[in-house]
Amino acid sequence: MFTSEFDVEALGSEIADALELIPSKRRIFSRSVDDKSWSSRIETAMQAYASAQVSALQPWLTANAEDTAVVLLVDLSGSMGTRIVPIASELRRICEAFSEAGISMAMLGFTTVGWRGGQSRQKWFSAGSPSRPGRLCDLLHVTFKQFDQQIRDDDWQSMLHPGLLCENVDGEALLWAAAMLEVRSEAKKVLVVLSDGAPVDDSTLIENGARFLERHIRSVIAELESNRALRLGAIGIGFAVDGYYANSSQLTEPDALSEKLATLLATLTD
């Protein structure tokens, strides 16, 4: 990477404050009461949440209630678009089911602070634009639910903010999530990625070649899949992820997320 100086890591509820000093993000992350788009997304997600069913997860939750830690890592790229609304409603139910079962679980998300490289690209340009700079954007890593805590409204609602979805650097996000799991004391450590496409950050790819992020994510996946202390799998959101992950499934309807997750978790912990 060229620099990590401008990367942001925050709880969902902290995003607005964390980005307040960044002029390009200040307006779209305003918690204004007249933000109709955000309010509409929350309302729609709550309606879907009211009817969401996670009964398919119950057998796995019951069988793995002890000595298991799970991380769900959600791709928050711009291509997720309006699909994030039904996905978020399902994820809230899933988080609650894990908490009720007493299973340690965290839900994380990854995107970028903005588009076109942000402050990292500006710094690179000021430094004379050296060739092959490595990752050239400002990462945004968000914790929506912490281990051993219930999901909170303000953390969850931030997932639905229209200004959140930007670009996706999957490899570094995987390493971040895996590092959280590695320090857990549970015997079974499971990382499940929800992804709707290949890693993309235009600023990075323009300066390093079209396959730069692709090579990195494949290297990271190979490293994690060879780690016997961690079980890794992925669910593709309208996207086939089997070309990346040894254990995976594909989701075409958001309301089937708990079923897909239950099947994948059973495979990973069998």
Per-range role (PLM):
Residues M1-D270:
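Acidic, glycine-rich A-domain
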